[in-house]
Amino acid sequence: MPIIHTFGFGGSTGAELCLVSPIYTSGAVWFVSSVGGTDAAAPAGKSREAPLASLAQAQTNAAAGDVIVILVNHTESLGTKLTLSKAGLVILGEGMGTSRPTFNRTADVNLFDVTGAGIRLENVRFATDSAAGYTADRVLISAATCIVRGCYFASGVNDSVSPALAVASGVANLTIDGATYFVSSGTSRTVTGFRGLALNGTATDLELHDVIFEGGTYGWLSHALNGAGAVTRLRAKDVDLLNGSDVVLA
């Protein structure tokens, strides 16, 4: 039985599903904000007025197919890997520009490790690393049928070793769309973002729609999009390669 949210989720900017009303969901809706939120076990976090403080807690509380709404100006720094394992989880960010939910890592771990099939990330900002030399893929997708929509991946002087977004070998039906940005901002040709999007092996049914690779002044240390294995059925439309951004596919 669908749950009817007559007035929507209550947002005014951000992911499209945060703005419409009424809206129907098949699972619970959880709210997250580092501004006044408090982490606690379920059922905490089901009220916009009393959100959880972290996405990590929301992932723990949620079940497969639930929705997590991250409120405007949320920030979260992670020193351990956050595994997103609940199949069909929908993660929606409110806000625009730098006010959208922002995540950064403080250790050499995957910031997000997406292992649940059908997970959707929308309108989330991934900041540059807090220190140089991290080798782990910043965001790693290793499950099928995921969607990355309207997200922003920043790479800078501390990001010369690992990609902003990586796709594990064998992943199928990944869609990246909705004005998703990969941006490099370095200080020299050798101190700049490593890669925006990395395909770590083979991929099947990869769709890129309205994706922007921005190399800034010094471009990318490797390639804006690098594919290490064969891609079966790549569909790309309105992909912009700007300022030294290039693509290499096996």
Predicted regions and their residues:
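Right-handed parallel beta-helix/beta-solenoid
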Residues: M1-Q57, D240
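Glycine-rich beta-solenoid repeat tracts in large extracellular/virion proteins
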Residues: T80-L84, A107-T115, A132-S142, D159-G170, ...
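Right-handed parallel beta-helix
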Residues: L92-E94, A117-T128, A144-G156, G170-T187, ...
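Right-handed parallel beta-helix/beta-spiral solenoid domain characteristic of secreted/periplasmic
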Residues: S77, G88-V139, S155-V157, S184-G186
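Beta-strand-rich, repetitive solenoid scaffolds
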Residues: H5-G8, L52-A53, N61, L92-G93, ...
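Flexible, charged surface loops at secondary-structure boundaries
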Residues: I23-G27, T60-A64, L84-S85, D113-T115, ...
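Glycine-rich repeat segments that build the extracellular carbohydrate-interaction surface of secreted
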Residues: W30-G36, A53-S77, L89-M96
